[in-house]
């Protein structure tokens, strides 16, 4: 009986994130990372505002299934205020978790840990990881842009 109530609570939290997602929308003045899941049609546009190494603000828009939208919402809650390195570590922990690998650090995912059950549904793994993959791409692009800026400064070019 207790397990049934716990599962119901988990499902309610996931449904709430899907129906009323946190950090939904687009941020002005930052490049959007757009990814899609051709298997089911989920599409995400992720915008991230960095303050040097920290994620200052983050938002997502797009169309997706319940799992994709809830995961996107939970991801934004988990990574805001984190360093790029911390956010990448969380993305890796999440990816491993939804593939069935247990990790004590899963607790750091916050409510996103509730999506561990996705591992039982392999066809939904891509739905759950779409936003996390977009986050990895945004961090990669940010690092590349910073490298180019640093290189131009080193070479004495105007940026």
UniProtKB/Swiss-Prot annotation:
| Binding, Zn(2+) | 40, 42, 65, 127
Q: Does the keyword Transferase apply?
A: no
Free-text function comment from the UniProt entry? A scaffold on which IscS assembles Fe-S clusters. Subsequently gives the nascent cluster to other proteins. It is likely that Fe-S cluster coordination is flexible as the role of this complex is to build and then hand off Fe-S clusters.
How does this protein assemble? Forms a heterotetramer with IscS; each subunit of the IscS dimer contacts an IscU monomer.
What the record says about family reads: Belongs to the NifU family.
Query: How, per the record, is the cofactor bound?
Result: Binds 1 Zn(2+) ion; this is probably a substitute for Fe-S centers.
Q: Which Gene Ontology molecular function entries are recorded, alphabetically? A: iron ion binding; iron-sulfur cluster binding
Keyword Zinc in record: yes
Keywords from the named record: Metal-binding, Zinc
A Gene Ontology biological process term? iron-sulfur cluster assembly
What domain of life?
A: Bacteria
This protein's name = Iron-sulfur cluster assembly scaffold protein IscU
What organism does the record attribute this protein to?
Streptococcus pyogenes serotype M1
* Cofactor(s) listed in the protein's UniProt record: Zn(2+)
């Amino acid at each position: 009986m207790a397990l049934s109530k716990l599962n119901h609570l988990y499902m309610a939290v996931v449904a709430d994130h899907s129906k009323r997602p946190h950090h939904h929308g687009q941020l002005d003045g930052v490049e959007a990372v757009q990814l899609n899941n051709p298997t089911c049609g989920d599409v995400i546009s992720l915008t991230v505002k960095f303050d040097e190494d920290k994620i200052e603000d983050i938002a997502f828009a797009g169309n997706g299934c319940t799992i994709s939208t809830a995961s996107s919402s939970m991801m934004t809650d988990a990574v805001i205020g984190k360093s790029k390195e911390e956010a990448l570590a969380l993305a890796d922990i999440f990816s491993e978790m939804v593939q069935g690998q247990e990790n004590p650090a899963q607790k750091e995912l916050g409510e996103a840990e509730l999506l561990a059950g996705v591992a039982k549904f392999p066809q939904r793994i891509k739905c759950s990881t779409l936003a996390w993959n977009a986050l990895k791409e945004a961090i990669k692009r940010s690092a590349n842009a910073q490298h180019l800026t640093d290189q131009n400064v080193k070479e004495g070019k105007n940026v």
